[in-house]
Amino acid sequence: MFNRKPQDANFSVERLFKDIVKAFPPNLIYNSYTSKFKSRGFWSRLYNTVEAFCKQGDVNHITGDVHYLCYLMSKNKTLLTILDCGNLKRLNGIRRTIFYFLWFWLPVKKVAMITVISESTKKELLQYVRCDERKIRVIPCCISDDFKPSPKAFNSSNPVLLQIGTAYNKNLPKVAEAISGIPCHLRIIGKLSEEQISQLLAFDISYSSVSNLTDLEIIDEYIKCDALIFASTYEGFGMPIVEANITGRPVVTSNILSMPEVAGNAACLVDPYDAEDIRKGVLKIFSDEDYRKTLVANGYQNARRFKPAIVAEQYVELYKEVYLLSMHSK
């Protein structure tokens, strides 16, 4: 298993595969390697690529972000996890062309199998890169066993609405517009920009924010909140939905891309581009006790799909498939 050297304050990939590896069966023999250098600049990436080539084994799994590690590896022994195609949407011009070729087009050609974390990401990837869709397998993210059900009486007088993330796609300005005038407190996880602070003040939002939390501190934020607002405009998966589900909190999330797939019947789905629709979803959760209870009950059931043991088993089966493929190609 080949992992990137973590970027500053960005450990989502590492958290995901840490939980998966812990759930591997004891008879699975594996080695886990982390690139020596962060994925920045030509020479660092070249070193990482050569190092990966020297350490390759019978089956090689590149766990995301460092797609270029596959360049020198044996194609029939290698699989690559692609988490999303977000950077292709953000970049433009020559930078986008180079990124597309080096991170998507070439790696897809250089590996035996690809895993993605949602059907939505699979469809998106196939829009960008032509390949046999049977080469792409959907294996979802898993929910850490550290998350536990934590029932809590709903604070109907002043609910705490949890917002995870402040990046552009997390849609904080639209959320602020949507909840303006609703008695509640917006608890924001992530660093706020001056512009975002101005927007929150302009809509007279009662809010607090915190960043750089540990995993256990993030879990505590879910426990203390009354509901999750996750009206994102772009996700490859949408892990906060499942984290709120397993904790026992009702969820308002977007009706686009991977989020309906991940949420199932365990969230109130809204149009993330329509502040009024977001507002209606929040008010429905705040005002309808039976609806809240239904979402919470459905959430507990939904979260079972993403247990580490279930996800790990899917990876193990794929490793066996890649191994047999490499044996037959000799």
Give each language-model segment a name.
Residues 233:
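Aromatic "clamp/platform" in nucleotide-sugar-dependent glycosyltransferases that forms part
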Residues 94-114:
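Membrane-proximal helix-turn-helix segments that form the acceptor-binding/catalytic region
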Residues 154-170, 176-181, 187:
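Conserved donor-binding/catalytic core segment of Leloir-type glycosyltransferases
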Residues 120, 142:
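Carbohydrate-associated surface elements
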Residues 253, 268-275, 282-289:
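Conserved acidic donor-binding segment of nucleotide-sugar-dependent glycosyltransferases
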Residues 1-70, 207:
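Active-site donor-binding segments of glycosyltransferases and PAPS-dependent sulfotransferases
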Residues 241, 250-253:
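Short hydrophobic beta-strand element within catalytic cores of glycosyltransferases
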Residues 190, 196-219:
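Nucleotide-activated donor-binding/catalytic signature segment of Leloir-type glycosyltransferases, i.e.
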